[in-house]
Structure formats: structure tokens, C-alpha cells
Amino acid sequence: MEYRDYGVFLDIVLDREINPEKFNELYKELLVNYRVIMLQLKAQSPIIRLVPYVEKQHVIYKYRWALTATTFITVFLTGYGLTSSFLSLISQANTTRIIAESILYTATFLLTLLAHELGHLFISRRELIEAEGPVLLPAPPIQLGFIGTFGAVIFTKTPPPTKKTLAELGIMGPLMGFIVATIIGLIGVFISPTIPLDVADKAMASGEIQQVDFSSLMFYLLVNMRRVVNGKLLIHPVLFVAYVVYIVTFINLLPIGQLDGGHVVRSFTRGKTFNAMGLAVPVLLLSLGFILEVFYGIGDIYIGVGIASTILYLLTGRHGHPGSANQCDESHCSWCIVLYILLLVLTAPIPIV
């Protein structure tokens, strides 16, 4: 055993690796009782690195209440815009109902966001991972071209101890958000009215409504639970919540940087492999989008997702992913991988031709 004191952290060179069970025990004890983060680095001779945990609040977290209040307003404005248009089409628009259904839209949308983040928070609390949040992030409302929010975030301040925990941390958020969105979607399907074909055609010609150009498999399955004869299903704003959440979930599951999909995929891949995948994803999506657009005119959704993934790669993917605290750990979460693939399939955007 050899000690190397670097001032900021201490390295201990070992003759052999600490087994995963013992590492987990020591990791939690050092963090809880001594506020020290323990890492096991993979090298010719395994290294235990001890780093003091410094209590520091994220700058965004300091403004959480202001951000949350602003998000409520911007999401409500989005709901107001969607609801007023929706109710006008079915000749049921009045101020009281518009406000009531805008509140319903706001509540359901924010519920899916909070369910997602609470899924992450559940794993963090269970595994004693230091985290703070969730914090809601406002964005321009639909009147200004967006959906009122950039989502929600929790700030993880200590690394997951094992690869299994890393995968669980990554999958639990999308899974909880998906489940809540699907329940909301089921409600939305059965409160969405149908309109006659001639009325739908007239409304589309005037630009009052638009045909959905792309969907996801899960949204398709939801909508087809309603049998519509000689008419069109008019998407209720509550059903629109599920539609948006599925698209956002797919993007979040891409294996890029520290997106949730990045956590899951990094748990069973090496650093170089993961970095190559993160770079390949935007290229593949953009290539697929351009090919489909040139030959079939249906590639715009993949171009859009490809642009989004490029931005996410530049923001979070260029520096890779640190992985778990124990680099020598070989644990895997099989059910996380199965759920990851299932969620990708169910939420992937599919052009409607």
C-alpha cells in the first residue's frame, strides 16, 4: 500500500481491488460520517482516491422559487393558448372554462416533470447520493414558439457508487415520467372529442388545426384505443401533454453526455466506446433525416431531433461521462437495460404517411 498526498485529495495505491460490497460500505460510511467522497480508479495498481466533499449550493438552486413560479406562469400561458383554440373549435369557449382547463393542463404537465425528477431523487436518497432539487425551468410559452418549460432538473453532487446504481439513477426518471404521462394520456384520449370529416377538412384548410405529422408508438397505441368512424380525433390539451412528454423522453434517452440515456449506456460501456456513441448519434439522426426528407419528404422530425442532439452533445457530451465512483465495479442492471430499450422503442418519433 502506498499513500500519495496531493493536498486537495489523497491517493492510496492498493495491491488489489476492494470488492464491490466492501467498497459500497466504505463509500457510504465515509460520505455520511466524514463528508469524504471515495473513488476507486482503474489502473495497473488500483487506486483509492479520497476527495473532501464541499457543501456548495448550485447557483440555479438558489433561485428555485422564482424559477418555479415563472414556470407555472409560462406553462399556464401555453395551456391557455392551447385550450382557448381547442374550445373555440368545438364552440365551447368561455373565460371560466378556458381558465379551468388551462389550470388542468398546467397541473398535468408539471406532474409529469416532477414525477420524472422524483424518480431520480428516489434512487439518490436510497443510495445516499447527495442531490438537491427538483427545480423547474421556465421557457417561452407557445405564443412565442415553445412549450413554456425546459423541464426540471436535480443537481447530483456525488457520483453513484456502482454501475448498477448509475443505471438505476438514469432509468428511473424517464420511467416514472413515462408512466405518469401514459396515465394522463389515457385520460386525454377519452376526453378528446371527435369532429366530422368535413369540419376537420375545413379547419385544416383554414389553418385552425393541423394533421399530426409524426407520432410515437406509445402515442399511436393510446389514440387507437378510441375507435373513430367518419371523423377525426381532436387532441385535447391533456392528451397533448403525453404527446410532448414522449418526444422529450426519447431525446433524453439518447446516449449523450449526462442525459439520462447517457447514464444508462455509460453503466455498461467503457469511456471511449461511450464517447464514440455520443458523437455518432447526432450524425446518424441528421443523416437519416436528410435521406428521408430528400426521398420521401418525411424527415423533418429526425432533422429536428438531430439538431437537438447536436446541441446537447456540444453542451454535455464533449467531455464524456465520469461513470460510477467505483471504476473497478462490474455490476450491471439487466432490468434497466431492458426498460431502456423498451422506452426508446415506445417513444421514438415515427413519421405518419
Please identify what each model-predicted range represents.
Residues 1-353:
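Hydrophobic transmembrane alpha-helices and their immediate loop junctions
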